[in-house]
A protein has these predicted regions:
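Short, basic phosphate-binding NTP loop
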Residues: 1-30, 37-44, 48-49, 63, ...
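ATP-dependent carboxylate-amine ligase
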Residues: 1-11, 177-178, 214, 237-432
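ATP-dependent carboxylate-amine ligase catalytic core
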Residues: 15-21, 47-149, 248
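Acidic, Mg2+-coordinating active-site environments of NTP-dependent enzymes
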Residues: 24, 100, 112, 120-121, ...
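Short beta-strand segments
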Residues: 28-30, 107, 131-132, 164, ...
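Conserved adenylation A10 loop of the ANL superfamily
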Residues: 29-38, 235, 385-387
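Short glycine-/acidic-enriched loop or helix-start segments at secondary-structure transitions
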Residues: 38-39, 64, 115-116, 139-140, ...
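Short beta->alpha connector loops
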Residues: 109-113, 167-168, 280-281, 362-364
């Protein structure tokens, strides 16, 4: 009851904000994968010309999204009436204050059918980006078609839309009613694409962005994995559509970096290459991360894979598919964390001939992984799993060459660290 009251008040304040600030543009980022990286890349490029508001935290729900749009931090005591009264006061101040931003870039997250319709009640998007339609929250959605209907609704509720051609099946195009839709992807025939000319671990990808408005734009982007280029492609496309020059886009491009826990390359023990993709996991994202690991030139490669949560009835099949992707000619070890990977992924990987070791929780895996890295100097090791109950970033922390790199890991706030301490304490108690 109280949550519903807060939500309705926040939605009304957002409506009032855009009435009071008609020149402020709202860009929404939806999709099954890569929303945060796409949002961050868009903000980096647009900042070269415009005043941009973007909350890097995962503020994408019915309560947190309005807060991010208004530029207000979530209160520490979310059940306190007085804390929310203070939030409402700040919201009124935002409405009354002259424009301090030109563009707001907002992530729109959906967990179930109807979530996007809730956003549509009070948001009028000038532009929408849909990053992909892949299995997510299948316990709630049931089918991929339901996921598509939900995510593509963002495109239909916007003035114009950009669709990731690589990660959205062409069969779902019939769901689009918006006539002003463009596509982006790693390859042509997407209207916005990228031609890779070179890759370097330090510098990233060098090549040419192919655009409608500005032709080819040469550039270098410090990201890892060709699928990590897609958020930058979306950002370049948005920059073009927002009237930026080639020089402005190139300048913004130089600032783009991987977001914490999203294909971030770090130095590890024994000269190892740590590929930190621990923020979350889904079948499409994990598949792309594995393919990227296979492309790394290293004496050996190791995959540390945690459960993919909220897969519902699809969990067995999706985990098994990933297990079948595990190639013994490419991987010296497949190390799993969690019950679903042990039950479904590990047997499939073993059947293919992979060396597999399973662990109930992340911290239990640490001594074994350290031992492997001591024996396999210079290995490339991928870490990827869902956040709830997996927390593979805590394993990465123990593998870092320098403790200074802890700042680059995901979920390191005091609140998150307390949550993880309590979780691992419960796991330890259950084992005793």
């Amino acid at each position: 009851m109280f949550k519903s009251y807060v939500q309705k008040r926040l939605e009304e304040y957002v409506r009032q904000y855009f009435v009071a600030h008609p020149n402020v543009k709202l860009i929404g980022v939806a999709g099954s994968v890569g929303k945060t990286s796409t949002k961050a890349a868009i903000a980096e490029i647009l900042t070269e010309k415009y005043r941009v508001r973007m909350e890097l935290k995962n503020y994408n729900t019915e309560i947190s999204a309005p807060m991010a749009i208004l530029g207000i931090d979530m209160p520490e005591k979310v059940r306190s009436f007085w804390a929310w009264r203070k939030v409402f006061k700040i919201a009124k101040q935002r409405i009354a204050t002259p424009d301090d931003v030109d563009i707001i870039v907002q992530e729109l997250g959906v967990d179930k059918i109807g979530d996007m319709a809730s956003f549509a009640r009070y948001l009028k998007l000038d532009m929408a980006i849909v990053t992909g339609v892949t299995p997510e929250h299948m316990e709630q959605f049931g089918t991929l078609e339901n996921v598509a209907k939900e995510e593509l609704m963002a495109a239909n509720m916007a003035g114009s839309a950009l669709i990731n051609r690589d990660d959205i099946d062409a069969g779902f195009a019939q769901m689009l009613t918006n006539q002003n839709v463009s596509t982006y992807g790693n390859n042509e025939p997407a209207e916005y694409s990228f031609a890779v000319e070179d890759f370097d671990f330090e510098k990233g990808y060098t090549g040419r962005f192919r655009t409608v408005e500005l032709g080819d734009i040469p550039g270098t982007v410090r990201v890892f994995g060709e699928h990590s280029l897609r958020p930058v492609l979306a950002a370049v496309a948005v920059g073009c559509k927002m009237g930026m020059s080639r020089e402005e886009i190139q300048a913004g491009m130089k600032r783009v970096r991987p977001v914490a826990g999203r294909m971030n390359v770090l130095r590890g023990l024994g000269g190892s290459i740590l590929i930190d993709d621990t923020y979350n996991s889904s079948p499409a994202a994990l598949s792309m991360a594995l393919k990227t690991l296979y492309e790394v030139s290293a004496p050996s490669r190791i995959a540390v894979i945690g459960d993919m949560n909220e897969m519902g009835a699809e969990s067995a099949a999706e985990h098994e598919k990933i297990g079948k992707m595990c190639d013994p000619t490419m991987l010296s070890w497949v190390i799993t964390v969690g019950a679903e990977t042990e039950k479904y992924l590990a047997p499939a990987a073993q059947t293919r001939g992979c060396q597999v070791r399973c662990f109930k929780d992340a911290m239990s895996a640490v001594p074994f992984i350290i031992g492997v890295l001591e024996r396999e100097q210079g290995a490339a090791i991928l870490f990827k799993g869902s956040q709830g109950g997996i927390y593979l970033e805590e394993v990465v922390k123990d593998m870092l060459h320098s403790s200074e790199d802890v700042k680059d890991l995901v979920r390191q706030s005091l609140a998150w660290m307390q949550t993880k301490r309590e979780f691992f304490a419960r796991v330890q108690e259950s084992d005793e």
